[in-house]
């Protein structure tokens, strides 16, 4: 190749090269999030076909703090179809708590052994290592506002919990939730990153900070 051809080879400016490197770094982080980022709410995008709607940062924090207060140091927490609460819990507590995410969406398998594949249609189809009544609290957010979905999810909740239940679902499910799980509606109103058409509420079966703030 001649010197003339070398001179005519397109060269990126320092600014353009830096921008390109930043773009590639962002792409890599989305594919392979770092340890400090992998628990960020939204690191995995909502899939509306799976009826996924993430909580706002404030709501996820409130629910995570409620769970921590309810179980105490060293407690075991199950998040059933509530991935954004799991993420906030792990963001707050890297150690001293056992926290599991029960989820249909296998993208959350990035969380390793704490991910348990879960299909509410088969409510008790769980790994042998998940023993009955082995969690101090179960936080559940059934993906669909239907009696069938709540009933089947309730089977899972009752199998997992040692007693405490924190249910998040529509206000229209209040009567069914009380019948199935013995829970009562809290004054705290959860919010999502996107506004939902249906009013959403929290329900518990124990004395909760969600009625007075933590």
UniProtKB/Swiss-Prot annotation:
Catalysed conversion reaction: L-lysyl-[protein] + 3 S-adenosyl-L-methionine = N(6),N(6),N(6)-trimethyl-L-lysyl-[protein] + 3 S-adenosyl-L-homocysteine + 3 H(+)
Work out whether the entry's keyword set contains Repeat: no
Specify whether Methyltransferase is a keyword of the entry: yes
Tell me the Gene Ontology biological-process terms attached to this UniProt entry: peptidyl-lysine methylation
Q: What is its EC number?
A: 2.1.1.-
N-acetylserine-modified residues are 2
A Pfam family reported for this protein in Swiss-Prot or TrEMBL? N6-adenineMlase
Q: Taking the first listed entry, what is the main subcellular location of this protein, grouped into a coarse class? A: cytoplasm
The entry's family comment says: Belongs to the class I-like SAM-binding methyltransferase superfamily. EFM5 family.
Q: What is this protein called?
A: EEF1A lysine methyltransferase 1
Q: Which organism is it from?
A: Homo sapiens
Underlying gene: EEF1AKMT1
């Amino acid at each position: 190749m001649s010197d003339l051809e070398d001179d005519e080879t397109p060269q990126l400016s320092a600014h353009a090269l830096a921008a390109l490197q930043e773009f590639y770094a962002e792409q890599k982080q989305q594919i392979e999030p770092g340890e400090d980022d992998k628990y960020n709410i939204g690191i995995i995008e909502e899939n509306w076909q799976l009826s996924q709607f993430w909580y706002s940062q404030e709501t996820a924090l409130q629910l995570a703090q409620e769970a921590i207060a309810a179980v105490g140091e060293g407690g075991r927490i199950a998040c059933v179809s509530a991935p954004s609460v799991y993420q906030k819990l792990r963001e707050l507590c890297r150690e001293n708590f056992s926290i599991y995410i029960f989820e249909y969406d296998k993208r959350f398998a990035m969380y390793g052994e704490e991910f348990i594949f879960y299909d509410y249609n088969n409510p008790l189809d769980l790994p042998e290592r998940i023993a009955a009544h082995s969690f101090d609290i179960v936080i559940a957010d059934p993906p669909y506002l239907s009696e069938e979905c709540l009933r089947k999810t309730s089977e899972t909740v009752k199998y997992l919990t040692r007693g405490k239940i924190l249910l998040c679902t529509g206000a229209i499910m209040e009567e069914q939730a009380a019948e199935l799980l013995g829970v009562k509606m809290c004054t705290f109103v959860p919010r999502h990153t996107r506004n939902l058409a249906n009013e959403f509420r929290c329900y518990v079966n124990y004395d909760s900070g969600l009625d007075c703030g933590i």
